[in-house]
Amino acid sequence: MGFEYGYSITKPTTLTVWEAQFGDFAYGAQIIIDNYLASGESKWKVESGLVMNLPHGMDGQGPEHSSCRIERYLQLMNDGWCNLTRDSLLSENYRPLRQSNFAVVCCSNAGNLFHAYRRQVRRDFRKPLINIVNKK
């Protein structure tokens, strides 16, 4: 994941995606998530548009096939989303998202995933996106 993080910094206009497979892949990347993804912009003023696809393990295969604990990533978020309203989502200023350190989404269909990826590339600033997915 360190390679993908570095690539997303050097090539900010590309869609850089890292996918954790079954098992403990996200746990091995936790150091990079804590030190670079969650706090990289506040520490070093470096923006990253890295997308992380993490399996949630709630689709019947059991917790041993999960690389994602949703509550862990929600606890890593700062308070930028506290002021999120419907009007701020519909407008183009994205101020609550600019104040947060990353976004966590759980897309329910392919259209939602397309627009989440599209938003990652089309914005004039970069924030990491953590996408909670199933492995089906």
Where are the regions that the model predicts?
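Conserved thiamine diphosphate
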Residues: 1-136
